[in-house]
Each structure stands twice: as structure tokens, then as C-alpha cells.
Amino acid sequence: KTSISLDLKSANDKQTALSLIEKADVLIEQFRPGVMERLGLSYEITKALNPGIIYCSISGYGQSGPARDLAAHDLNYMARSGLLSLSGDEHGQPGLPCALIADIAAGAYPAMMNILLALQQRAKTGHGAWLDIAMGDNLLPMLYWALGEGELTGRFPTMGEGLVCGGSARYQIYRTSDDRYLSVAPLEERFWKVFCDAIDLPMSDRDDASHPKRSQEAVAKRLASMPLAHWLALFEGKDVCVQVVNTVSEARQDPHFADRGLFEHRIATDNGSLGALPVPIASCFRDPPGLKDYPRRHHKESA
């Protein structure tokens, strides 16, 4: 892998870019709509140079529509999609997700998927494609259950309702007595029974279908009565669908992830090395774990 930095407003650097485009399979750009056109690197221009090119434009709201030119970031895309409205605190304030869901799950991953589809299509037809990847659009498929429920019943779910938005005792985050937290998700009846038996939940509090609030409060009270270590020991070896809410530091040291080799890849730097970030690529497509150099390339070498 190599890299190059170009000033696309420079005539020489722009010519370098055009020379690379002539030989490229894929071009990915993440400017606001219209910027590549102003730079003289629109799809029409690149297609004229390279008819088979896969031209992937990743933007917030897409290449068309009334919101296409709006300045926005990940949080804004999640807000517009309705995703933020479904989880929050007891006062109804939406929670602040600490993951760039739109950038990764609604931007990079759909781009990769559509690029692969376009390459397959080109192998059959010889034609390239312009891929309009809108992060705002691609968050909506993640709400398939909420959208589906609304279409079927005429009422869309809101915060604190439904199976995965806080309306069920079987899909919750509960506090322990030492202020740690457990993610509890025994959705299926067989898991729910094992879970209830394990925490010795009274039979009168187990009918969460008829009395969801009472069941939720009973589970919360029970789990808050003992520390995390007690519950982890109690759940050991049982199919209860319970997992401690790890800190990032704890996740980094998790023996399961270590066994899976997620942090074995390292990148050489001028002052030593750094752990490479995990990527969702199957190990059969990657080099064995080890120390790798970071991408380097000087302008003169590329020009």
C-alpha cells in the first residue's frame, strides 16, 4: 500500500491525479456535492478518461435532495434519521452515542459493499459506475424493526417502548451494587427462564408480557443488591445472554479478543511501533500478524 498527498488546486498536482485516475479501478471521494466538479474531477471527466472507473462519492445526505449541501457530522445524521430518539435517560433526553456509527456503518461499509458489487458488474458489462453513498440514507436500514413496526401498526416506537428501546425487562442495562453494569438480553423464553432462575426472581415478577414495568423494576432491584463479581460467578456456564459492560481498557485486555488476534498487528513508526486498529476483514484475506510499515510515498516517486 502506498500513499500520496496532492494539492488538487495545483495544476501539476491535478495532472498527477488525472494520470493516476486513468489507470485506477476505483476512485473514492468524500467532499460535499459539487466540490469534485469545481476541481475538474467530476464523474463525467473521470469517466471520459477511464470508462470503467468505479467512482464512489460518500457524503452526508447524498448528491441530490434539499439537504445535500448541509454541513453536518455523524451526530447530525443520526439525529435526522430518528436513531437518536430511541434511547436516552429517564427524562427523555436522547443519549450521546460514543461511536461514529454513520461514518463507519452507514458510510465506509456501504461504500465497500457497493464498490464490490460495481466491480462484479463491470466484469460482466465492462462499464463503470457512479456510486452515491449517503450516510443519512444508510442509517435508516438499521431501524428496520422500528420502521417495520410503524408501517404495520401505524404507530412508530419512541424512547422507552418496544423490545429493544427500553420497554422490556429482557433487554436492559442494569446496575450492580458496586456501580458496575450488566447488559441483559435473554429475549427468548428459554434464556429468560434460566436468567430468572439464576437470580432467583420471584415467579410473580416473571410475566414481563403482562407487567413489563414490574418485571423490569424487580430485576433491577435484584441485580442492584449484589456486586458484579457475585453475578458473574452465578452466571458462569449458564445460557443467560448477560455480559458485563466493559470499559474500553477492559475490552482491550479481554482474553477472548486476544485469542482472536485482534490486537496482534502493529505498525512501525519513526519512534517505535503502535498497535494497529482492528478491521472487520477475515483473517484469510490478511497477512499474518506482525510489524508492518505505514504507507509511504513521496510526490516525486508518483509523478
PLM regions and their residue ranges:
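Active-site-adjacent "lid/gating" segments in soluble enzymes
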Residues: 37-182, 186
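Aromatic-enriched alpha-helical interface/lid elements that frame and gate functional surfaces
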Residues: 165, 169-242, 249, 303
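Short acidic-hydrophobic surface loop/beta-edge motif
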Residues: 172-177, 263-269
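Alpha-helical scaffold segments in soluble metabolic enzymes
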Residues: 19, 114-118, 194-198
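A structured beta-alpha segment of the ubiquitous adenosine-cofactor-binding alpha/beta core
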Residues: 2-48
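Flexible, small-/acidic-enriched active-site or ligand-binding loops
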Residues: 267-303
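Alpha-to-beta junction loops
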Residues: 23-24, 51-53, 237-242
